[in-house]
């Protein structure tokens, strides 16, 4: 039986394939990505992950299902204890300071992506917001699985790849997929279409995120 997320996966494939094959990922696996570009990516991702974690708690506040609430609460805490902690290890290796973090402007694409997810919740529904969060989980897992066999000659990049191919991370992805299917079963056809729309938009923002990082996007880019 084809599930709701099976349908999402099929619809998003053109965008996801572009992400897997994006020059950012290709250069990272080849060990050719400038460290300044990875540094830029990490600084932007710190903002993104912080808001991503908050959204887990905010969505949980609007749900009634105990299992769903528990997963989202643990997801929010896991981001603090796990993925964000990994990023902190990267920051230490790259000598990224708290002052540098505080002074780094949020790039337009990162800003808009986060606002898109908040809009899915506050101008939409918790089910829609769950669907908007799913591509970040799922796409990174697919990228990790796609490039793990090749790896990267740069140890920092190899650590990044291994984060998203780990058994623990894959388990979280599978739980998020199950939660999205559950959410889809609770709403009508019109709302499932809205869930589909935000999923595709999040997938497009994921693709834009690589390009943002490669170009070191800033707000001046909007006026050029």
Walk through the language-model features, giving the residues of each.
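Active-site-proximal alpha-helical scaffolds that flank and shape metal-associated catalytic sites
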Residues: 67-171, 200
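Amphipathic, well-ordered alpha-helical segments in soluble domains
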Residues: 20-21, 48-55, 82-86, 109-113, ...
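Short alpha-helical hairpin
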Residues: 9-34, 52, 177-186
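Basic/polar N-terminal segments that are highly enriched at the extreme N-terminus
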Residues: 1-6, 10, 218-224
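Long amphipathic all-alpha helical oligomerization modules
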Residues: 169-200
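Acidic, carboxylate-rich catalytic segments that either coordinate divalent cations
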Residues: 196-224
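Alpha-helical bundle segments that constitute or directly flank the non-heme di-iron/ferroxidase center
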Residues: 13-18, 33-62, 82, 131-141, ...
């Amino acid at each position: 039986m084809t599930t709701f997320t099976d349908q999402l996966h099929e619809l998003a494939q053109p965008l996801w394939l572009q992400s897997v094959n994006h020059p950012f990922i290709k250069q990272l696996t080849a060990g050719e990505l400038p460290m300044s570009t990875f540094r830029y990516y990490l600084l932007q991702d710190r903002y993104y992950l912080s808001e991503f974690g908050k959204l887990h708690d905010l969505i949980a506040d609007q749900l009634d299902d105990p299992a769903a609430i528990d997963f989202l609460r643990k997801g929010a805490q896991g981001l603090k204890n796990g993925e964000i902690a990994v990023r902190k290890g990267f920051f230490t290796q790259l000598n990224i300071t708290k002052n540098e973090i505080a002074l780094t402007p949020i790039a337009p694409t990162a800003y808009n992506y986060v606002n898109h997810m908040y809009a899915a919740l506050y101008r939409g529904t918790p089910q829609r917001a769950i669907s908007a969060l799913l591509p970040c989980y799922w796409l990174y897992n697919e990228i990790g699985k796609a490039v793990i066999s090749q790896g990267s000659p740069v140890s920092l990049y190899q650590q990044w790849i291994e984060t998203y191919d780990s058994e623990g991370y894959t388990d979280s992805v599978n739980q998020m997929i199950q939660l999205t299917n559950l959410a889809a079963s609770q709403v009508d056809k019109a709302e499932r279409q809205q869930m589909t729309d935000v999923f595709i938009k999040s997938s497009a923002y994921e693709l834009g995120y690589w390009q943002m990082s490669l170009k070191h996007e800033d707000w001046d880019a909007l006026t050029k």
